[in-house]
Amino acid sequence: MSNSVVAKRYADALFQLGREKNSLDQLVADFLEVRQIFTNDQKLNVFLKHPKIDNEKKKQFLADVFKGADPVVINTLKLLVDRHRTSTIPSIVDHLVALVNDTKGIADATVYSIRELNTDEKEQLQTSFAKRLGKRSVQITNVVDPKILGGMKIRVGNTIYDGTVSNKLNRISRSIVSANK
């Protein structure tokens, strides 16, 4: 089974458990912290994948590191150690956050631009895309991309809205070439 399918199943189960316990926000906050640690600390990943280290030691280590977290988080981490699936943690968290945001009517958007957007520009994008997507709000992550000549490219899920100058130039070029045939 692919890691993506596995991650979605774990995220679905965690989402349902969080809803039952009315602790979705706390669960997401704890898992975001876990993801950050797993993403930034390569030594932790090496430790957890080391075949000569007993799983009980790995689970105790994780319980000590994340002792302030929700018990569901700690138990999930222990389960992932037992099943040798710790590499799926970032994907599980991403899927869980997407499920929670979808339930709350929040869309995640990545905006690629030549420069950092100011607060007013972000607010305008949030307002216009919230209406367009039928969501209550849009969380924007701004990525500065020096390859963009001007304008911006916005990615929401699998949909890309490309308003860059280079894309417009490519469209003009294609229309000129097709007109000359």
UniProtKB/Swiss-Prot annotation:
- Source organism, top-level taxon: Bacteria
* Compartments where located: Cell membrane
- Which UniProt keyword terms apply here? ATP synthesis, Cell membrane, CF(1), Hydrogen ion transport, Ion transport, Membrane, Transport
SUPFAM superfamilies documented for this protein: N-terminal domain of the delta subunit of the F1F0-ATP synthase
**InterPro entries annotated for this entry?**
ATP_synth_OSCP/delta_N_sf, ATPase_OSCP/d_CS, ATPase_OSCP/dsu
Q: Which GO terms describe its cellular component?
A: plasma membrane; proton-transporting ATP synthase complex
Please list which residues make up the signal peptide: none
Q: Which PROSITE patterns match?
A: ATPASE_DELTA
The answer, when asked if Cell membrane is one of the entry's keywords, is: yes
Specify where it is mainly localized. membrane
Q: Which HAMAP family match?
A: ATP_synth_delta_bact
List the protein's name. Answer: ATP synthase subunit delta
What taxonomic classification does the UniProt entry list for its organism?
Answer: Bacteria, Bacillati, Bacillota, Bacilli, Bacillales
